[in-house]
Amino acid sequence: MLGCLIKKIYPNTKIIYINLGRTLLFDFYYSRKCFPQLNHRLIRSNQDCLLADFNYIEAEYLDQVIFASDIFINISSMQEMDYEVISKYFDAFHNQDIGSYFYCCNRVSKTLPDGAEINFSEYGWVANSDQTLIDELCPWHQNFPVNWPPFYKKFDGPHQHRLVRLIK
């Protein structure tokens, strides 16, 4: 859990998880297991304050919650979404009052079960305003661990990673 690692290194950081409701349960479970003494809170509207150490927003409620973050991180889940859902995330990221950063690491291209092809380059990047700091094939996320030698296997396709400074 990347959020737990960030919290361990930067203890004053507030973590906001945005995920599908069922998957968010696992985020909550493992974060709570790592940090049982800290505050964990489900956020569903603007009436819920993002004051807990760990805040959880169901993706289904993303457009109903206004939040601020210094950095957004997405690893290997936008490749599972259609463009309409990806667009909601990008809208939320770009509606920040502060200059935020977005780190994204996903497959260059993936065909979803319904046959739709999702391409990293078409996610909703704003070339004229966002400042790209890193944009390359990801050197650390081309393989995944398995239980037999050589204990890793290549993903079905290459992963791209990009770090941008979001300009409002």
Q: Residue ranges of each PLM-predicted region?
A:
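Conserved SAM-binding loop of SAM-dependent methyltransferases across substrates and taxa
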Residues: 1-10
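Conserved SAM-binding motif I beta-strand of class I
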Residues: 14-20
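S-adenosyl-L-methionine
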Residues: 30-66
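Conserved acidic residues
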Residues: 69-70, 100
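A conserved beta-strand element that flanks and buttresses the S-adenosyl-L-methionine
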Residues: 73
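A short, conserved alpha-helix within the catalytic core of class I
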Residues: 80-93
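Conserved beta-strand signature within the Rossmann-like core of class I S-adenosyl-L-methionine
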Residues: 97-110
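Rossmann-like AdoMet/SAM-dependent catalytic core
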Residues: 122-168
